[in-house]
């Protein structure tokens, strides 16, 4: 929950570092994965501008439909500290409780016996109760505006210092809002993008419905982190090859934080007439990434496949089924997809359909980096043919890379790729 734009933090004074265990400077600113993930099942998954609605397995959630205290098996109070965001955190139900349909996080200037601070505010964290590595997080929430207000939906690593203190440990801010602004912010923090003042160059403002609930979605994969508001993609932070942990500390578990902060750091002083501030959270839902996705390209984009070599594009001609397929042109060309969540010592089949534009050409479907020797199968027909490979993951391997590879010049097409657990 750092402040996101450099110009927003120039006037802020850096103070002590602390974020539970990962020293963050905040003065500135239900069911197992389906065994087969096939073809048309992922139609909506990787649309470039809208969030996925299929192929995700719900693994953790809180609907906040009770009254009184929050579920202590899932959350604990966000502790008060010495940095801006947690300066007024208060571990009392008056500041973090359920109202029958929402988690209500409140901030006011009420007098609390035995706690003589100017303001009291609420927040919760899932640290020690739930954390995740890769997946989709949906939070539906609304909040009030006011001078000095600072609600946020964000994540920090657990263990906290796997890659050092803040910001090297990493931070994912799905939503931050300050004061009366008509925009909210998505931000990434790490040792590469966070400057000395606590601001980040990996930040994006986005409009939102200022008077009602909004759905804030974060999709985190081994390749990138994507932020959506109301199912519309707003910002993507991509992993850089060779960037190391300074650029990508995002391969360890992170836990969730929801808070209504204010009165220090980025938003500045509170105008008491604007109190109380509150953030109402309708639900939090966390989903596991599918093993394999976008095998049919009906989304119209290549993601989460990556490309290298000649030209790779999704086209609306020559599809085997549906209306789209992948086309590779030019010289040596490949598309690849990095898979996570595989089971060690387990056999899978990866396959698909392909055709070449002229006799004598060929294209391969294969898998590598799974704990064994790369294997592939060749297709050289001018009409769609199916081929596949089987592979068994190593004793400690949970990842693999599948590919569609054209070794020479020419044009080939691919469609309806699939992954099966045997």
From Swiss-Prot:
It catalyses: Endohydrolysis of (1->4)-beta-D-galactosidic linkages in keratan sulfate. GO terms for molecular function: keratan-sulfate endo-1,4-beta-galactosidase activity. InterPro entries: CenC_carb-bd, ConA-like_dom_sf, Galactose-bd-like_sf, GH16, Glycosyl_Hydrlase_16. It is found in: Secreted. Its main location: secreted. Residues 1-46 form the signal peptide. Its EC number is 3.2.1.103. One of its GO terms (cellular component) is extracellular region. It is an enzyme of class 3 (hydrolase). Residues 47-292 form the GH16 domain. GO terms for biological process: carbohydrate metabolic process. The keyword Nucleus does not apply. The keyword Signal applies. Keywords: Glycosidase, Hydrolase, Secreted, Signal. The active site is at residues 171, 176. Residues 291-406 form the CBM-cenC domain. PANTHER family: GLYCOSIDE HYDROLASE FAMILY 16 PROTEIN, GLYCOSYL HYDROLASE-RELATED. Hydrolyzes internal endo-beta-galactosyl linkages in keratan sulfate and in various neolacto-type glycosphingolipids, producing sulfated and non-sulfated disaccharides, and glucosylceramides respectivly. Belongs to the glycosyl hydrolase 16 family. This is Keratan-sulfate endo-1,4-beta-galactosidase. It comes from Sphingobacterium multivorum. The lineage of its organism: Bacteria, Pseudomonadati, Bacteroidota, Sphingobacteriia, Sphingobacteriales.
